[in-house]
Amino acid sequence: MMDNDDALLNNGGPQSGAETVYGTEDNNMVMSEKNEQVVSIVQQLAGSIYQEFERMINRYDEDVVKNLMPLLVNVLECLDASYRINQEQDVEVELLREDNEQLVTQYEREKSARKQSEQKLLEAEDLAEQENKELATRLESVESIVRMLELKHKNSLEHASRLEEREADLKKEYNKLHERYTELFKNHVDYMERTKMLMGSTHSQMSTASERMDVSRARLNPVARSSGPVSYGFASLENSVMLDTETICSVGSQSDDSGPPSLQNELDNLSGTLERGAATDALQQQHHATSPQSPDSSPVVPNVPTNVGRSTTKKEQRSDNNLYQELSFQDNEESEENEIVTGSWVHPGEYASSANDNYFGMGKEVENLIMENNELLATKNALNIVKDDLIVKVDELTGEVEIVREELNAMQQSRTKLRQRISELEDELKKAKEQVKQQNTEQEENDVPLAQRKRFTRVEMAMVLMERNQYKERLMELQEAVRLTEILRASRTVDNLDRKSKQSIWKYFSNLFTPSNRPTERVADGLGGGPMFRHTGGGSPAHSHGSPSRGSGGGDNRLALTSGQPPVHPASAGLANALIMPKDYAEEGSSERISARRREQYRQLRAHVQKEDGRLHAYGWSLPINKASQEANPNRHSGGVPVPVYCNPLAEASPHMKVFCAAGVNLHGGFTKNGQSLIPANSPYAPKSTLKIAEITSPTADQSMEALDRQMARVSLETLEPETQLSSFVWICTSTHAASTVSVVDANQSATVLDAFPICASHLLCIASVQGAMESDYALLEQSEVVKAGEMLQRPGEGTELLGKVEFVRVKPKSDDEQNSNEKQQQEEEEAKEATEKSNEQLPAVSAEEPLGNVEAIKIRQPLPGAPQRLSTDGNQTNNNNNSSSSSNLLFATKSLNPILETKDRDEPAMSSVGPTMWLGAQDGWLYVHSSVGRWHECLHRVLLPDAVLAIVHVEARVVVALANAQLAVFRRQTDGQWDLNSYHLVTLGDRNHSIRCLCVAGERIWAAHRNKIFIVDPVSLNIVHSLDAHPRKESQVRQMAATGAGVWVSIRLDSTLRLYNTHTFEHKQDVDIEPYVSKMLGTGKLGFSFVRITALMVSCNRLWIGTSNGVIISVPLAEVQPKSSSDPHGQMPLCCMANAQLSFHGHRDAVKFFVSVPMLQQPNLNGGLTFTNKRPDMLVMCGGEGYIDFRINDNDMENSIQLEPNQTIENRGDKSYLIVWHVSQR
């Protein structure tokens, strides 16, 4: 037994990552299989003891067991308490195990995140180091350039200083030469005076002297001219002239011994000084010298030929006249002038002998010195130029050496970086190899169920984060809060559990002492593996319905699909016998990698679906074979299997149009106060009424037999399900980025859009159908306390949230300007609509022969009058006797015929809100009221509410609207039957920062969901009757509610569990988790099906229709439990079992948006009205969502089946909103 318990715990325990849901009443909830087996053990013991006591009482007497009874009860209570303690400990162990797994996964996640952050930090540090190194290299290059510029600047300063020193030396030389010149001039003057004196005494020698003077003058002519080659500074002279000059100088120097110190010594000293100065400035390099460098050289005369010969190595350039040449030329002119001025006679011989010898000797010496000085200066200049060139060359070479050194350092740094990069790449290669190994091991674990795995793989976590990133943020918080809440609840309710167990045991054994009420049935053992369903009915025992597992059951329990159904018609019966389903399957991505991965996932999904043993696939549904639970419930009406009859996009022309909500049209009512109906009598939907309203509302009116008959008919009509009272018309709200549109379709002909018109620029969040004014509505209006009290019906709230506050709001009447602006706005809207209609009419019609894509024909059981037919542009039906290939072509058209009033082109009479209406709520707070009979596009009333409108319901001649600020707006009719939108009541249900997500009508009361609470409100008195917590955590909001019979099914945000509550006692009856079922049917989460969230919920055809966030559609047949009193028709409890659940292989790519159920056909009676009977009509269940998917498609057939239209992409095909319609027979 313990082994079986452990196995059951392992198979049915909470999975890692899934949310655990806890109820409020342990007697009416199913926690796990082990809990039920523990209770069944106690029940078995109690049943066996009960039988023994019964035999003892029958054989002996009641006194035998009176003393033994308390002891046995105490023993059973202790045993029950021990079992419950064991259950709580098992729950705590499971919670601790889940916490441990979550902590491990969180630790691994944090560890990987830390590794990633460290890796990013290292990369940032590497980038910073690289930038710093680059900046450092730039700084070093700038510093080297600065050093080079400083060196050049220093060299230029040194060169400037040397030039200044040279200039100073030249000035000194000039001063010395000037002083020497003055001395020479004085000596010359003295010599001339002496010569004059000598010429006066030696007159006899005049003739000879004159001749010698002519010869000397002839020789001196080249020298005396200031324009000669020497006087003008040329370095090369004529040889003849140089020889003559040397001869003269030699003669002069030998003849004169008594003069002043020789000029040659001073010039030699000066040349030596200049040579030493030049030697200090010149570099130590060999160069052709133009003059001797040794101070001990021979006299000037022997050096002259050498200088002349060497002068050919340099350019011959003209220099300025030196000071001596100019002065010597002036002296000759002055001597001639003196000779002319003085009239004294001078002997020519004396003049020639003295003047010529001295003059020519001194001039030659001075000339040689000057030439040597010029040559030395030219050599010095040449050496300085060479020195400067060498300095510049050295600077260039130094800069190049620095640049090469920097390049070498940069190459070394790049080499070290490349080595580091190579090491990093090697490490990454090692990590990649390890990851490949891990992925190989993870792929081997893909077929292992989640319950048997130790943790989630990285691939699964990545898929979950990608598909449900908006829910993953709060998953850990919700699980932690659930765990804490469960611990607190378990600690608080231990005493309550003991008390309840004692009461149940005493109540169980109390029947022993009442022989008249002694049961005749044995207690059924609860050994089934499924959940138990119990009802609290008197002293009857609890019945346990087993849930057969997959693959159990023999051939006798096989489901009969065709029992009670018409025979299958052949395919040649026409287009009405075929289901046209274009395979508009959209791609999720355009890249090859994503496509290959998706094909692999679909292949695994298809393989998983095909290996499901023990289930039957029929009409696109996965059906259980075992019918043990159905045989145990004879009151159950499953109604066969839903058959798909239609699947296509809602609007082919608008691929980006998204569906939001839809509602079936209720055409009942519509009577004025005088008993006149707004629907014409010739219409097949015209109601039948022969009694005036005044006769009913009048207190003196007699109750005739017709009124009683009509009342009985109304009662019989109310006993039917609400969806059976609807017509087959459906209003579907769609929205784009620009505006929201309503499309009116007939569910019998879903391919035909009867009308489509815009409503507003905001999104339409909800829609509801409200029947017209009935006779009872006028009686309620006159007798209502709300109408009598008016604004007096107000009530203050309780607490800080003002819970239950009722306030009356009256809308101010509009001024004339506002009315004119509204009329002008309506006129512009009508013009825009007409322009849109004209543009649509001008579009080319699609030919009937043009295919719209690959289609798939599925045979159905009977021809449907509402099957999609081929339509022409004028709305008439074309010939159906075409080839079988033409049946794949489908044309979507919009009928201009109103089937209710039988009018064309919107040529209907004026409508009012007395008749049936459609109420639409927008996101911007506007509430719109349109007629559902005629002139659908015209808005009858509209009002701006304080916040967004989220839900609308109609009950007890009132319309209740749920707002996003936690308030309910209640509207009522006026005395003339029209709806009053100028005044309404607001009921506050909680914190205004949170919204009322959904509304539900259960009986005559409203169930409003605010966060995790459900408030039951009386729509007449506006009082809060009761409130209950659907979930222990406030952040877990109630999202959907569906009422039927005596129960209300509730779904929670971020939760895959449905909860059932009793509408009368508000008790929690059952919990149903759909996540294990979806995981079992569609795999272990490859496509994200393991994280199931409920987005659409509806009860219809005795089935619970469930739509999930990933497009999966589930239909669960309900097992109704009969109430205690048969007089209450609404007392059936709609329990269900997931073992009988049916999963549709036709689904959506995104969340399921809505379910709508309408009657399939309503045949008009002979009197012109609709005939309503107690028989259950066949129903059409419509589902809407984004995209279409078939979970059975093989590999890449889904991508290959897509045929794109012109100017259309695969992404646009996936954006379309699809409608899927099933036919459900209830006969």
Swiss-Prot record:
One GO BP: regulation of JNK cascade
Locations of Basic and acidic residues compositional bias?
807-817
- The domain of life is Eukaryota
GO MF, one term, reads: JUN kinase binding
The ranges of region (Disordered) come to: 1-22, 281-323, 517-572, 804-851, 863-889
Q: What are the RH1 domain coordinates in residue numbering?
A: 25-113
Query: Which sequence ranges form a coiled-coil region, renumbered to this chain?
Result: 84-191, 363-489, 814-849
**Domain (RH2): residue spans on this chain:** 453-524
- Keyword list, A-Z: Coiled coil, Cytoplasm
Skewed-composition ranges (Low complexity): 290-308, 541-550, 879-889
GO CC annotation: cytoplasm; Golgi membrane; membrane; neuron projection; presynaptic cytosol; trans-Golgi network transport vesicle
Q: What does this protein do?
A: The JNK-interacting protein (JIP) group of scaffold proteins selectively mediates JNK-signaling by aggregating specific components of the MAPK cascade to form a functional JNK signaling module. May function as a regulator of vesicle transport, through interactions with the JNK-signaling components and motor proteins. Syd is required for efficient kinesin-I mediated axonal transport.
Subunit comment = Forms homo- and heterooligomeric complexes. Binds the TPR motif-containing C-terminal of kinesin light chain, Klc. Pre-assembled syd scaffolding complexes are then transported as a cargo of kinesin, to the required subcellular location.
Annotated protein name in UniProt:
JNK-interacting protein 3
Native species: Drosophila melanogaster
